[in-house]
């Protein structure tokens, strides 16, 4: 932190109390920890080892809740009460439109966020300010809370050092086409599966497909030209170090067209560009607003366009270098966190101002939503407890079965048992049983 950044701090914003269940993941780093590091703000962590400490909320000049934190509903209510009584602005940060998860999204199929949706909606109504990653997300949220600020995701240049694009590979080298992302992106990868299969045949022996994080789609696993790097970590600091050590010639960023994906940020563009690698991106809002087709990236919206874009980059190393160079220049000019961290400070200062003028959510509706949320959270907890009890019982029974099997094995392998069997056979031979 330099003195100029220190001078940026508003007099009333020095300590931020942050509630998240994972302070080391990408979400927490991009949305608060990284900006706070650049600004010299002290982050007071409200959760340790899964235990929530609501009282720490009063230590902050502003309180920030990470998207689905309100699922800890009793803790959320205590924090909200402290914020109101102590006149501390309460900020809810939302980076994904969890209310609109597609039917085939893994998180929806596994109900990972089902129990948190209503508590999060209540927090969205009650927050003094909501910070979001994109304008599309703002347009959705603003119907429920007028105090919304867009804080885009930026590349933290304390962790990332953008590379100079190179003219690669050598004529006899294979071209590496890569994808990086979590397991929830399987439906997106399925979108371009036919294209990958076509390219693999068209350029047989010349291509390698690399997947960092998520498993290659079904139909690609086990192929010699497909490589899975599953060791990608959830710790964002370690991930940044690890991913910058990787190499590729072309990156892909497919997204299926739905409201959930249209509200996503362009973070993949930033991280791909940091490696000095050109990319092909879905022609959707996360990328439409930051990528100029043919200049700092390529955009595709159907199989034919995906194939044409990838083929053009495969066959033209000069185009790869040109696009990568432009993307890296755009990254350095417009997307470094060091140049935009002050936006977080401005947003938190705005939260202090809107707190005094914000119209409270309708009391009757808030009370109803709070009661429903309590019941949903209690039901979710009850269900999980029941599942744990059944799981523990299954483990106990399996242990008992193993013990009985060991006992039986001991009996049947003993000398006494073998002699008993011998005598039985002898008796049956002397006096066969009557039919």
Q: For the regions a protein language model found, what residue spans apply to each?
A:
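Conserved acidic donor-binding segment of nucleotide-sugar-dependent glycosyltransferases
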Residues: 291-304, 312-318
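N-terminal pre-catalytic "stem/leader" segment of glycosyltransferase-like enzymes
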Residues: 1-70
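Boundary detector for helix-to-coil junctions that initiate low-complexity/charged tails
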Residues: 353-435
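A charged, aromatic-enriched C-terminal amphipathic alpha-helix characteristic of glycosyltransferases
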Residues: 318-349, 353, 360-370
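Membrane-proximal helix-turn-helix segments that form the acceptor-binding/catalytic region
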Residues: 81, 110-129
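Nucleotide-sugar-dependent
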Residues: 187, 233-271, 280-289
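Conserved catalytic-core segment of nucleotide-activated headgroup transferases in glycan assembly
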Residues: 18-39, 154-246
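Donor nucleotide-sugar binding/catalytic pocket of nucleotide-sugar-dependent glycosyltransferases
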Residues: 126-163
């Amino acid at each position: 932190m330099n003195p100029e950044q220190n001078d940026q701090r508003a007099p009333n914003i020095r300590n931020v109390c942050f509630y998240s269940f994972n302070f080391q993941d990408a979400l927490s780093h991009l949305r608060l920890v990284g900006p706070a590091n650049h600004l010299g703000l002290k982050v007071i962590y409200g959760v340790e080892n899964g235990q929530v400490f609501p009282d720490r909320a009063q230590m902050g000049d502003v309180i920030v809740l990470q998207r689905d934190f309100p699922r800890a509903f009793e803790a959320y209510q205590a924090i909200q009460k402290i914020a109101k009584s102590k006149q501390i602005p309460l900020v809810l940060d939302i980076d994904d439109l969890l209310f609109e998860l597609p039917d085939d999204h893994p998180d929806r199929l596994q109900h990972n966020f089902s129990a948190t949706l209503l508590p999060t909606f209540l927090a969205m109504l009650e927050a003094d300010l909501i910070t979001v990653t994109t304008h599309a997300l703002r347009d959705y949220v603003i119907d429920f809370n007028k105090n919304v600020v867009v804080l885009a995701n930026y590349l933290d240049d304390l962790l990332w050092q953008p590379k100079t694009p190179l003219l690669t590979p050598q004529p006899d080298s294979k071209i590496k086409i890569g994808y990086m992302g979590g397991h929830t992106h399987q439906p997106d990868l399925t979108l371009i599966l036919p294209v990958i299969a076509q390219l693999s045949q068209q350029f047989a022996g010349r291509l390698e497909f690399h997947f960092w994080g998520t498993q290659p789609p079904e139909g690609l696993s086990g192929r010699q030209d497909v490589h899975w790097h599953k060791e990608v970590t959830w710790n964002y600091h370690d991930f940044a170090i690890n991913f910058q050590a990787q190499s590729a010639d072309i990156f892909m960023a497919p997204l299926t067209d739905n409201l959930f994906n249209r509200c996503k940020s362009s973070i993949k563009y930033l991280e791909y560009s940091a490696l000095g690698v050109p990319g092909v991106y879905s022609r959707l809002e996360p990328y439409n607003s930051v990528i100029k087709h043919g200049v700092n990236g390529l955009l595709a919206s159907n199989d034919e366009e995906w194939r044409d874009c990838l083929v053009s980059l495969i066959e033209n190393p000069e185009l790869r270098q040109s696009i990568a160079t432009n993307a890296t220049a755009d990254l350095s000019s417009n997307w470094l966190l060091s140049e935009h961290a002050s936006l977080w400070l401005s947003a938190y200062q705005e939260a202090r101002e809107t707190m005094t003028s914000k119209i409270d959510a309708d009391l009757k509706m808030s009370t109803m939503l709070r009661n429903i949320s309590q019941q949903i959270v209690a039901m979710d907890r009850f269900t999980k407890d029941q599942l744990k009890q059944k799981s523990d019982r299954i483990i106990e029974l399996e242990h008992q079965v193993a013990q009985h099997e060991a006992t039986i094995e001991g009996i049947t392998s003993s000398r006494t048992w073998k002699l008993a069997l011998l005598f039985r056979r002898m008796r049956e031979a002397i006096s066969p049983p009557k039919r």
